[in-house]
């Protein structure tokens, strides 16, 4: 059952810092109207179904890379792709990963926002530069890449993490990596197990858009009028269509 959120909403008159997660920034990018309804008025989109298999892959990859983190050696995949780095060992690693409770945070003074995000992994190269890593899982025939329009959200996700770590005083490489697990669909039988091909995809991030976007978010939230919907927003299209039918038939 959907409920209106009464807490953690933006109040233009409040002087308390307001938390904005990486996922909410992405929601703003998808549709300013949905974002405003969510963060200002407490009306969220219906929740999507959890991708439990993807979560399982994330957990197992983290465990696997943690073995090499403890040994301070590169993972075999890093060697295969010629990546001169090792998984970063840091006392805050688990905190940075925990997007629900804390994650990595930064207070953005111009907006009075606290920006938060939970990273999958961080590697470090011999120069001490951090490399942001994100785990992804899919099951498709053909080459896995990050070239589809809908995968722009993956790229923005990477760039926000890079920005957050820089704002926390770390030297961060513009190069990040997606560790992509692709479920095999060409096996003769399931046999109670799902096998994956795992590859690493390099991505050159550019976080120049973030400061401007945060200012736009602040301006939108501070206004008393609901912004226009993104014309491609399926949630708003459904809402508007349902409303027009109800008014017509009512």
Describe each PLM feature range:
Residues 1-129:
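Metal-dependent nuclease catalytic cores that hydrolyze phosphodiester bonds in DNA/RNA
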Residues 98-212:
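Mg2+/Mn2+-dependent nuclease catalytic core
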Residues 1, 10-14, 19-20, 164-250:
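Metal-dependent nuclease catalytic regions and adjoining charged, substrate-binding loops involved
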């Amino acid at each position: 059952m959907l409920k209106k959120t009464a807490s953690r909403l933006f109040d233009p008159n409040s002087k308390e810092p307001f938390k904005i997660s990486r996922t909410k920034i992405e929601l703003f990018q998808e549709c300013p109207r949905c974002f405003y309804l969510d963060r200002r008025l407490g009306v969220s989109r219906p929740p999507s179904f959890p991708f439990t298999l993807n979560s399982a892959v994330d957990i197992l990859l983290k465990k696997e890379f943690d073995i090499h983190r403890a040994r301070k050696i590169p993972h075999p995949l890093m060697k295969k792709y010629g990546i001169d780095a090792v998984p970063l060992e840091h006392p805050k690693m688990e905190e940075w990963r925990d997007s629900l409770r804390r994650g990595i945070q930064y207070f953005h003074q111009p907006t009075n926002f606290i920006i938060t995000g939970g990273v999958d992994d961080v590697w470090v190269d011999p120069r001490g530069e951090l490399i942001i890593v994100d785990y992804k899982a899919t099951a498709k025939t053909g080459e896995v890449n990050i070239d589809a329009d809908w995968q722009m959200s993956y790229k923005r996700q990477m760039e926000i993490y890079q920005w957050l770590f820089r704002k926390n005083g770390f030297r961060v490489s513009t190069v990040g990596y997606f560790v992509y697990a692709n479920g095999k669909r060409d096996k003769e039988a399931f046999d109670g197990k799902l096998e994956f091909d795992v590859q690493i995809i390099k991505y050159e991030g550019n976080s120049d858009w973030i400061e401007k976007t945060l200012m736009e978010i602040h301006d939108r939230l501070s206004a008393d009028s609901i912004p226009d919907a993104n014309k491609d927003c399926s949630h708003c299209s459904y809402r508007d269509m349902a409303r027009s039918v109800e008014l017509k038939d009512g």
